[in-house]
Amino acid sequence: MTEPTQTQPAVTADENQIIAERREKLRALREQGVAYPNDFRPEHHAADLQAKFADSDKAALEANPVEVSVAGRMMLKRVMGKASFATVQDGSGQIQFFVTPNDVGADTYDAFKKWDLGDIVAARGVLFRTNKGELSVQCKELRLLSKALRPLPDKFHGLSDQEMRYRQRYVDLIVTPETRDTFRARTKTIASIRKFMDNADFMEVETPMLHPIPGGAAAKPFVTHHNALDMQMFLRIAPELYLKRLIVGGFERVFEINRNFRNEGVSPRHNPEFTMMEFYAAYTDYRWLMDFTEQLIRQAAIDALGTATIQYQGRELDLAKPFHRLTITQAIQKYAPDYTDGQLSDDAFLRTELKRFGVDVSQPAFLNAGIGALQLALFEETAEAQLWEPTFIIDYPVEVSPLARASDTVPGITERFELFMTGREIANGFSELNDPEDQAARFKKQVEQKDAGDEEAMFFDADYIRALEYGMPPTGGCGIGIDRLVMLLTDSPTIRDVLLFPHLRRED
């Protein structure tokens, strides 16, 4: 038996001509009444067959015939007189079909020769190995289930236009195995997190996506209108305040994995719609949260990739090692050691330095900023991008942490952390502020900042204050950016690579 090399014929006509020719083939199928049948049920998957019979040689398969039924997309085809081959791809992988008129009948074989790459086909047959050792299905029954009207990208060039990969993700998934692997890893990551949380006695919940008051984060919301209630609503920027209401209600460990929406810029790290996991545990604090978060991320890597040592953009990252912990000023002085303690406590010096880095300190967020907020801004300019290894930055200032519990020992700071890896924030957590009077005062301060022009300052949420007045136990809470975590685990340079359908400008 002669076996072809797996190549794809060159396109000889433009795409419009190809589509026209395929529509004509579809018209003929409609006339025959067999255009889109739905009565074939595959019983096997390509990857399962490849794995199960990996050690079965040609003689073994001939001695013990294995009948299979498989369906998928035809990715390659080579017609060679009275024997033809096709590579068929299903959701698990690929397997080769061997087709002859003696096996499937002359009419079916003639029809098969007219089928196109991208068509969805199905076969029943017997497994065998070719002379080159490739596991194949000797087709006894062959059917066309769905006609592809548009041609797939050329095998050797693939889908090279990056924006087209995002815009037509369905094509990207067909032709790019690495893309399929990325989203399988994403699914495994989220499944691992759910299992980890379940094992730690957390209850998964769902809270509203439409909020009467945006809260739980410093961000600009999307605004909509509820017609029946005739009221302005906001797509949620965070679920935090609802989840903490559940802590008040007696659910002592809760978590949610869901979408957040922020009407802000698009970048390699930001998408207006993104997935967040937030969890809250009564009778814990931010130090417990750091230990728990470290264990969760390490386990997610192991479950998704089989290892806690990963490669990201050509550099190794070992999640098995203990994560570092630094204060904001310690991080600044580690990566910009010329700064003295005195300079980092000098308002005028900090503002001058921020100007040198191109920060507009005249914007509303900086007008009444204290030392802590200025230190944080300098940290973002000098140290944040340098935090390659997993590092918890701790002890954030009160003025930028309106929902976090204040430190009992150090005035002006909170029991808060942010986790950084590869120079980007992955998680944010803190001991929760459960003093209703302190929380009300901080909300009022946020309202003052909003009135001064800070669009990201929080609103005053009177119902949340009312909930706290019923008493919330000491609590720790944390949010983990699922998209950024998956970027890390899949070696993806941009958030668009880990979103199935990222937001893009309208197509012209």
Curated annotation (Swiss-Prot):
Binding residues for Mg(2+) 2: E425
Subcellular location: Cytoplasm
A single BP term in Gene Ontology: lysyl-tRNA aminoacylation
Cofactor binding description: Binds 3 Mg(2+) ions per subunit.
InterPro entries: Aa-tRNA-synt_II (IPR004364), aa-tRNA-synth_II (IPR006195), aa-tRNA-synth_II/BPL/LPL (IPR045864), Lys-tRNA-ligase_II (IPR002313), Lys-tRNA-ligase_II_N (IPR044136), Lys-tRNA-synth_II_C (IPR018149), NA-bd_OB-fold (IPR012340), NA-bd_OB_tRNA (IPR004365)
Cofactor: Mg(2+)
Major location category of this protein: cytoplasm
One Pfam family from the record: tRNA_anti-codon
Catalytic reaction(s) noted: tRNA(Lys) + L-lysine + ATP = L-lysyl-tRNA(Lys) + AMP + diphosphate
GO molecular function annotations of the record: ATP binding; lysine-tRNA ligase activity; magnesium ion binding; tRNA binding
This protein's record includes keyword Kinase: no
EC number: 6.1.1.6
Keyword Ribonucleoprotein among UniProt keywords: no
Sequence positions that bind Mg(2+) 1: E418, E425
Keywords, alphabetical: Aminoacyl-tRNA synthetase, ATP-binding, Cytoplasm, Ligase, Magnesium, Metal-binding, Nucleotide-binding, Protein biosynthesis
Tree of life domain: Bacteria
PANTHER family recorded: LYSINE--TRNA LIGASE, CHLOROPLASTIC_MITOCHONDRIAL, LYSYL-TRNA SYNTHETASE
Subunit architecture: Homodimer.
UniProt record similarity statement: Belongs to the class-II aminoacyl-tRNA synthetase family.
Protein name: Lysine--tRNA ligase
Gene: lysS
